[in-house]
């Protein structure tokens, strides 16, 4: 018998479990590649201050869950508890936003560490897959990331989940909301746990985010962020919901959804598994938009949006699915248009080719000249270019250009929609 055992909250992967793990990793990397994402890897540990500043010192992640240690130079380091902060640090340090076409679309698959009570789908060492879209305020990407996450679950034949969304305002408006929450919760202190009573002062948003407290009527009736949104923010949220409706992505608005990290300042969303295997209520995908994180990390004043997937939870959710995970590597297509009025049609075609044709497709969300389109296509490593031009579109046609052979032809829309991997 071995004298040594693995630490609590960790697992050994081998044989079939390892095969399933690697298959899922390859599936996720391949699927997001079709949306134009490039992989990035960052160190397994960072200076602790990075996570304290990004996640917020009052967050559970920082105050309770981080693995902290000092190195031989007496500097505080932390094992990575989540993926976004390290990616943003790498992007800023290596000036990736200044040396690449924007938006910058990155994906990662990394081990993370949190000191939590182990249970189904929750380990102290776990793996997180995530994507980040950096350097754009265009809310199309809010929609695109939700559509991507939804597509991942659909392709895995996972159906036991609900999508919840909310909109978190700017730091100023959020501070007004926090003050209102503090005044409200102080009236009902006795109905809250001792921990929540402390959070009234430190960060009342954590009360809303607490899985047990959020079930209480007094918490459900707390002031909502919607009362503090500007008209512009309300219009933006309405537009995101309209895009989801147009693409038949089902969702429900949860005004108590705030996520567990302090850097969100726009759309937030969670795909919540309802599988009994995950105790009936477990977030498998979560993310949102962040307006100040890049700047706070020392970079330019750019926004970003991203999401993370808990791999161990997703593997458990897959037990309810008999879908085989396939790994396909193929040519990359790029869609462009010359007229702004064709933008919505280009978006629809992009989504159709990704979902129905299983193609690796990205889109240029701007009307630029042909020579710039070709240069950008080369930098994005696209092999084929689909162009929507007004004259051809009136005849239900598009232009297909092979960027390797430079062969160009005009095809009917029906022919394009028959292209396979």
From Swiss-Prot:
Its EC number is 6.1.1.21. SUPFAM superfamilies: Class II aaRS ABD-related, Class II aaRS and biotin synthetases. GO terms for molecular function: ATP binding; histidine-tRNA ligase activity. GO terms for cellular component: cytoplasm. InterPro entries: aa-tRNA-synth_II, aa-tRNA-synth_II/BPL/LPL, Anticodon-bd_dom_sf, His-tRNA-ligase, HisRS-like_core, HisRS/HisZ. It is found in: Cytoplasm. CDD domains: HisRS-like_core (cd00773). Its main location: cytoplasm. It catalyses: tRNA(His) + L-histidine + ATP = L-histidyl-tRNA(His) + AMP + diphosphate + H(+). Keywords: Aminoacyl-tRNA synthetase, ATP-binding, Cytoplasm, Ligase, Nucleotide-binding, Protein biosynthesis. GO terms for biological process: histidyl-tRNA aminoacylation. PANTHER family: HISTIDINE--TRNA LIGASE, MITOCHONDRIAL-RELATED (PTHR43707:SF1), HISTIDYL-TRNA SYNTHETASE (PTHR43707). Homodimer. Belongs to the class-II aminoacyl-tRNA synthetase family. This is Histidine--tRNA ligase. It comes from Ureaplasma urealyticum serovar 10 (strain ATCC 33699 / Western). The lineage of its organism: Bacteria, Bacillati, Mycoplasmatota, Mycoplasmoidales, Mycoplasmoidaceae. The gene is hisS.
């Amino acid at each position: 018998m071995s004298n040594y055992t693995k630490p609590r909250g960790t697992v050994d992967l081998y044989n079939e479990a390892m095969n399933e793990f690697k298959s899922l990793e390859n599936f996720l990397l391949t699927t997001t590649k079709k949306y134009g994402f490039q992989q990035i890897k960052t160190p397994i540990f960072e200076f602790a201050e990075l996570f304290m500043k990004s996640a917020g010192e009052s967050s559970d992640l920082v105050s309770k869950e981080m693995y902290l240690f000092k190195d031989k130079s007496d500097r505080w380091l932390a094992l990575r508890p989540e993926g976004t902060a390290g990616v943003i640090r790498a992007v800023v340090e290596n000036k990736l936003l200044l040396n690449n076409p924007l938006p910058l679309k990155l994906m990662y698959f990394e081990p993370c560490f949190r000191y939590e009570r182990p249970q189904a789908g929750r380990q102290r060492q776990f793996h997180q897959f995530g994507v980040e879209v950096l350097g754009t305020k265009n809310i199309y990407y809010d929609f695109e990331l939700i559509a991507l996450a939804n597509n991942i679950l659909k392709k895995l034949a996972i159906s036991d989940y609900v999508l919840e969304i909310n909109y978190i305002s700017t730091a100023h408006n959020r501070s007004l909301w926090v003050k209102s929450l503090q005044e409200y919760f102080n009236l009902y202190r006795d109905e809250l746990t001792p921990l929540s009573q402390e959070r009234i002062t430190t960060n009342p948003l954590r009360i809303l985010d607490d899985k047990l407290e959020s079930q209480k009527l007094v918490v459900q009736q707390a002031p909502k962020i919607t009362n503090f949104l500007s008209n512009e923010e309300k219009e933006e949220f309405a537009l995101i919901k309209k895009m989801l409706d147009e693409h038949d992505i089902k969702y429900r608005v949860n005004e108590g959804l705030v996520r567990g990290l302090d850097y969100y300042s726009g759309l937030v969303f969670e795909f919540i598994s309802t599988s009994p295997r995950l105790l009936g209520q477990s977030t498998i995908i979560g993310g949102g938009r962040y307006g100040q994180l890049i700047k706070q990390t020392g970079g330019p004043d750019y926004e970003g949006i991203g999401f993370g997937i808990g791999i161990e939870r997703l593997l458990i959710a897959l037990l309810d699915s008999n879908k085989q995970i396939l790994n396909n590597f193929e040519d990359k297509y790029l869609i462009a248009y010359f007229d702004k009025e064709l933008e919505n049609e280009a978006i629809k075609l992009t989504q159709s080719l990704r979902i129905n044709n299983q193609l690796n497709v990205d889109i240029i969300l701007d009307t630029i000249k042909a020579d710039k389109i070709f240069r950008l296509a080369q930098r994005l490593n696209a092999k084929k270019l689909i162009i929507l031009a007004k004259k051809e579109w009136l005849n239900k046609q598009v232009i297909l250009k092979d960027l390797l052979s430079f062969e160009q032809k005009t095809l009917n829309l029906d022919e394009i929609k028959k292209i396979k991997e």
